[in-house]
Amino acid sequence: MPVARAPDREGFHAFSYTVPASGATPDFVIAGSGEVPEGRSNYRDHIIAKGDTSPAGLLQKVRWVLAEQERRLAALGRGWADVTATQVYTVHDIHPFMASELVARGA
């Protein structure tokens, strides 16, 4: 959620557009709400470490999101070594956790 002028409720939409290209190397895109387990009745009530911006809370969220992205990568037969770019949207400083957690996963 944005810090300034946040909407009344969460929302995020993403899409990928692809076209065939001869000679192109295989590629992939993974997107989505990684901070909530899939299949829940609503988003807000199931956010991992909801509202906890302590170092322990942020670390819990980072670990959950990275594990969820690993699950999605595995479903495509991929791993962190295949990832060429990652975008993370947050107002909190998670860099210390991302560095240690990604390296531990072989990224």
Annotated model-derived regions:
Residues 1-107:
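Short, polar/acidic, helix-capping and beta-turn segments at strand->helix junctions
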